[in-house]
Design a protein with these regions (language model features):
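Long, contiguous binding/interaction regions
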Residues: 1-62, 71-206
Length: 206
């Protein structure tokens, strides 16, 4: 008998265990958090560094398990191998990587409000229309002492706008700074336009 792969072993376990999670339809239920601890352990046993998110669609009564590399590009192959090997699980949708949440997105992070329509980026060294690109994300209220907050909020916005994989593969360098009073020949775009900006560059490459 052929030995099962680590991916198959994971899905064999999850196929049975998922029924316990499916019985709790309220994602805020304290019982659910306790049920997710074994899932975290089994996922880390498969590949340390992988994380997951759970979603639930009340209309279709379907759960979603998102397997994520948490932005670590080196772990992308492990995510893809695991999700590709997934067998159908009743009431569950299995997804690789955090997906885009739409063109417009707002978050509150460490006391700051981040709105993709009101945050702007400047492409850096973009003359050759290649991908990945470097971007400078600028804020009128940027303060250097709060740099980590601005960086954290920026990455959360990018993850929501582009999805995990696109953020890592299509953006080579990301910096945050104060928006200058005059921009000269620089072109500003709102972060809400970033995905379409990247898509247009990819079409030029093709």
């Amino acid at each position: 008998m052929q030995k099962k792969s680590s991916e198959e072993k994971f899905w064999d376990w999850f196929s049975d265990y998922s029924q316990k999670i499916s019985a709790v339809e309220d994602l805020s239920d304290a019982r659910l958090h306790k049920l997710l601890d074994p899932l975290s352990k089994y996922l880390h046993d498969y590949c340390e560094g992988l994380v997951f998110e759970i979603g639930y669609d009340k209309e279709t009564r379907t759960f979603e398990l998102v397997i994520s590399a948490d932005g670590n590009k080196a772990l992308f192959p492990a995510v893809e191998r695991l999700v590709y090997a997934a067998s159908p699980v009743r009431q569950w949708k299995i997804t690789a990587f955090r997906q885009p949440k739409g063109r417009n997105y707002t978050i509150e992070y460490n006391g700051y409000h981040f709105d993709s329509d009101k945050v702007f980026f400047i492409p850096i060294n973009n003359a050759d229309n290649s991908v990945p690109i470097d971007i400078e994300v600028v804020y009128p209220d940027y303060k250097e002492e709060n740099r980590n907050t601005f960086l954290g909020g920026t990455f959360l916005l990018l993850d929501a706008l582009l999805g995990e994989k696109c953020t890592e593969l299509d953006l080579a360098y990301i910096n945050v700074s104060k928006q200058p009073d005059t921009v000269g020949d620089c072109k500003y775009y709102s972060l809400s336009m970033l995905k379409s900006y990247l898509d247009s560059r990819k079409k030029q490459i093709d």
